[in-house]
């Protein structure tokens, strides 16, 4: 997959509502929309590059690998850096 084409402009009408984000937000690749961070200890989408709240990183739980996440064996979690 290729990176999105950010030169086409930004239509914020397609952006999600982030008013109920409990753990902050992060900007998409083109810096157009904001998305909710996943909270500490909660599942996150490591494959899609979902961010976690400050001080945490979306990764496989201890004892598991990225392959375990990709194959659906386990979900990634927001774990302390």
Curated annotation (Swiss-Prot):
Asked whether the UniProt record includes Oxidoreductase among its keywords, one would answer no
Query: Which SUPFAM superfamilies has this protein been placed in?
Result: Growth factor receptor domain
Tissue expression as described in the entry = Hemolymph; Hemocyte.
**InterPro entries, per this entry?**
Growth_fac_rcpt_cys_sf (IPR009030)
* BP GO terms, sorted: hemolymph coagulation
Q: Does the keyword Glycoprotein apply?
A: no
Name the UniProt record assigns to this protein: 8.6 kDa transglutaminase substrate
The source organism is: Tachypleus tridentatus (Japanese horseshoe crab)
């Amino acid at each position: 997959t290729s990176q999105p084409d950010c030169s086409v402009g930004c239509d914020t009408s397609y952006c999600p509502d982030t008013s109920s984000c409990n753990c902050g937000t992060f900007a998409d690749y083109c810096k157009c929309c904001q998305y909710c961070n996943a909270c500490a200890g909660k599942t996150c989408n490591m494959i899609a590059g979902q961010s976690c709240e400050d001080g945490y990183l979306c990764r496989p739980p201890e004892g598991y690998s990225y392959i375990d996440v990709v194959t659906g064996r386990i979900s990634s979690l927001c774990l302390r850096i």
